[in-house]
């Protein structure tokens, strides 16, 4: 089986928006024989962009999985979104993949979202190769793209191909391993001629090959010895070194082409097979057993079954689909599994391999593979499913909290019931989507990562669930926190005939910067019985959902229960829960709570002519400029700007740059809001 696993490649395609990820994926499907016709993103016909919203907008919204064969290897491919609002799709895909292809726009090189997805891949130690796409584009520069990798990503980027021609004259590439020229005919089948290197490229190719060998030889001692002794390295020597460097995540080989014009994708597929790891090349997955002890699982079908659920989707024909990556053991359809995260047993009805939104039934799946499961009702993203006799919880995923919200109101009574179902289904699918009811107004609030994110979700409610809703204006999701330390008492006593209620606590509250809510039990001598401590914590968690300033969630607070008392008859869990919330309210009077506003990382690209206007506009929005650099005939500006100041920015940027400016925005952190903003928020809240 290890021999078979060696032939697996689980990889994703990741990039900045519009770099050509999906077009590259479509060419891969065509060349591997998975598709018999090429689907184009701009025609709304891409296989991997199957959602109606994706076809209309020409962007990828949800990660799409497929599988194919190439030169005797089994490929599991996931095409991920490039827009920051859907970064959760990239995060959960990279968590379960063994490798990735980073696609760069040949004109722009590393762009802001490239940096984001690169960081995500680094977080999960995902080996990568790089495809510089759109080499036929005006202004395309392969060597500039490599420099941006070195300067902006700080990585060892090594060309293993160089282009022949550029822009409209791009005709092929030189393979620096083989020292041969590949000249493409540009037709769908991507036929090419292998020729000697043109004379006017020979010197450049020799210099670049020498640089490549310098970069890669260090990854194998035997090869390094041959190289230093002046021996000629074989093609296999070089490939072995590149593979080792890639798997160590210390080397990033760079290829070039233009997927849309059918140049370079077959060589990219060769590189996926040659250089990206198989499941047995990556480190074992870590987790904890049912006693909390660390445990490792290897990609071995003979070990106990363990898999991670990384995505949940709703299929109109089969219902709930749960995507899993199997790390060890084997799973058969019709069997029972144990959800160690939820402590529940569930039955696997069917197993399917996904091709975008199409399903191919399979009977079983083994370690190292990816599939979707039908029949799991309680398993959600990040859950571990395993053998009940050998329980394990694998390393879990952590997702960003929503920063923007809006109200949704059903248009009719019939829509009310359908809306509740739609929201619960969408929340199951998307860990960065939240829905709740505003207790003061009774409104249903939905929260997400950005305006586009919420716009797509509302559109899905209307189309997929036939729910008609009125939508409110986007609102900022503020937070609150404490800035000083205080001890607070919470005492709840109620006597109304029969058994009373008694709960009494003393809790120390203190700021807990960037560490979330932390609860500490410092009770000694049984002053508060152990069985009520959890209820104290639960009472605080509930109280934190509505802060003292404007009713926003209170975050980054440490609460230590250190004293209290109890009554033999009247004490109850509910009484201590209420006492804890009373202590929180008392603390809020003296801990000097402040309002926190979300601060966004904003990357703006503008032509030189409009640079001053754009900079001035950012400053007006309370933005802090962090850096700028020249990119061709444009300026790239990095800034931190409060989210509340960014509504309507797309329209203003278009106006200020004659439609030529672009920007990308993502959440950075929460920071204390100025007094004027706090007062505005309090006034607005009071009017509701």
UniProtKB/Swiss-Prot annotation:
BP-aspect Gene Ontology terms: ribosome disassembly
Domain of life: Bacteria
NCBIfam families linked to this entry: EF-G, PRK12740.1-5, small_GTP
Residue sites binding GTP per the record: 15-22, 79-83, 133-136
HAMAP family according to UniProt: EF_G_EF_2_B
Gene: fusA
Main location: cytoplasm
Family: Belongs to the TRAFAC class translation factor GTPase superfamily. Classic translation factor GTPase family. EF-G/EF-2 subfamily.
Single GO MF annotation: GTP binding
Pfam families: EFG_C, EFG_III, EFG_IV, GTP_EFTU, GTP_EFTU_D2
Name of the protein described by the UniProt record: Elongation factor G
Subcellular location as annotated: Cytoplasm
Every tr-type G domain range: 6-280
Keywords on record: Cytoplasm, Elongation factor, GTP-binding, Nucleotide-binding, Protein biosynthesis
Stored InterPro entries: EFG_II, EFG_III, EFG_III/V, EFG_IV, EFG_V, EFG_V-like, EFTu-like_2, G_TR_CS
GO CC terms of this entry: cytoplasm
Purpose of the protein: Catalyzes the GTP-dependent ribosomal translocation step during translation elongation. During this step, the ribosome changes from the pre-translocational (PRE) to the post-translocational (POST) state as the newly formed A-site-bound peptidyl-tRNA and P-site-bound deacylated tRNA move to the P and E sites, respectively. Catalyzes the coordinated movement of the two tRNA molecules, the mRNA and conformational changes in the ribosome.
Signal peptide positions on this chain: none
């Amino acid at each position: 089986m290890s021999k078979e696993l060696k032939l697996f490649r689980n990889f994703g395609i990741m990039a900045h928006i519009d770099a050509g990820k999906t077009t590259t994926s479509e060419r891969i499907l065509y060349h591997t024989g998975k598709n018999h016709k090429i689907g184009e993103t701009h025609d709304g016909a891409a296989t991997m962009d199957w959602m109606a919203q994706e076809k209309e907008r020409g962007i990828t919204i949800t990660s799409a999985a497929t599988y194919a064969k190439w030169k005797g290897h089994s490929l599991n491919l996931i095409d991920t979104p490039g827009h920051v609002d859907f970064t959760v799709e990239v995060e959960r895909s990279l968590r379960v993949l063994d490798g990735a292809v980073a696609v760069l726009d040949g004109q722009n090189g590393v762009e802001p979202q490239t940096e984001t997805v690169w960081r995500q891949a680094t977080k999960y130690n995902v080996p990568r190769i790089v495809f510089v796409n759109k080499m036929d584009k005006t202004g395309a520069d392969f060597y500039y793209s490599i420099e941006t990798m070195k300067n902006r990503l700080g990585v060892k980027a090594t060309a293993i191909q160089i282009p022949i021609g550029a822009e409209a004259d791009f005709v092929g590439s030189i393979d620096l391993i083989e020292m041969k020229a590949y000249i493409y005919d540009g037709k769908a089948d991507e036929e090419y001629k292998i020729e000697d290197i043109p004379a006017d490229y020979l010197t450049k190719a020799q210099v670049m090959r020498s640089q490549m060998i310098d970069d890669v030889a260090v990854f194998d001692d035997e090869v390094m010895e041959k190289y230093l002794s002046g021996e000629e390295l074989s093609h296999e020597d070089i490939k072995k070194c590149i593979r080792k460097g890639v798997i160590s995540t210390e080397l990033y080989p760079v290829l070039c082409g233009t997927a849309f014009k059918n140049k370079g994708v077959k060589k990219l597929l060769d590189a996926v097979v040659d250089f990206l790891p198989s499941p047995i090349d990556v480190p074992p997955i870590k987790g904890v057993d049912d006693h909390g002890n660390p445990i490792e699982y290897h990609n071995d079908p003979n070990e106990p079954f363990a898999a991670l659920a990384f995505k949940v989707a709703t299929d109109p024909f089969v219902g709930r689909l749960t995507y899993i990556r199997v790390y060890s053991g084997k799973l058969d359809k019709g069997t029972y599994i144990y959800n160690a995260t939820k402590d529940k047993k569930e039955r696997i009805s069917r197993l399917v391999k996904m091709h975008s939104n199409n399903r191919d039934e399979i009977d079983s799946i083994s370690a190292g593979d990816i599939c979707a499961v039908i029949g799991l009702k309680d398993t959600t993203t990040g859950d571990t499913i395993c053998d009940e006799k050998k329980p394990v919880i694998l390393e879990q995923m952590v997702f960003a909290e929503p920063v923007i919200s809006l109200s949704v109101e059903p248009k009719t009574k019939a829509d009310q019931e359908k809306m509740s179902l739609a929201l619960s289904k969408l929340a199951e699918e998307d860990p960065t989507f939240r829905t709740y009811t505003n207790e003061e107004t009774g409104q249903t609030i939905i929260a997400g990562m950005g305006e586009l994110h919420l716009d797509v979700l509302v559109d899905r409610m209307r189309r997929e669930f036939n729910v008609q809703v009125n939508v409110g204006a986007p609102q900022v999701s503020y937070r609150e926190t404490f800035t000083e330390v205080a001890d607070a008492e919470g005492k709840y006593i109620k006597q109304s005939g029969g058994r009373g209620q008694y709960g009494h606590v003393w809790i120390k509250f203190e700021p807990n910067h960037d560490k979330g809510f932390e609860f500490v039990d410092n009770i000694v001598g049984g002053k508060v019985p152990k069985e009520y401590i959890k209820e104290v914590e639960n009472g605080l968690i509930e109280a934190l959902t509505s802060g003292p300033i404007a009713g926003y969630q209170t975050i980054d607070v440490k609460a230590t229960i250190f004293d209290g008392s109890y009554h033999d008859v009247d004490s109850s869990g509910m009484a201590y829960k209420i006492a804890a919330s009373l202590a929180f309210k008392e603390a809020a009077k003296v801990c000097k709570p402040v309002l926190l506003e979300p601060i966004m990382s904003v990357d703006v690209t503008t032509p030189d002519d409009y640079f001053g206007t754009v900079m001035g506009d950012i400053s007006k929005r309370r933005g802090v400029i962090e850096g700028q650099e020249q990119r061709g005939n444009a300026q790239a500006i990095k800034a931190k700007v409060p989210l509340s100041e960014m509504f309507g920015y797309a329209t203003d940027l278009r106006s200020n740059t004659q439609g030529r400016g672009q920007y990308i925005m993502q959440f950075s952190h929460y920071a204390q809001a100025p007094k004027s903003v706090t007062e505005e928020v309090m006034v607005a809240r009071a009017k509701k």
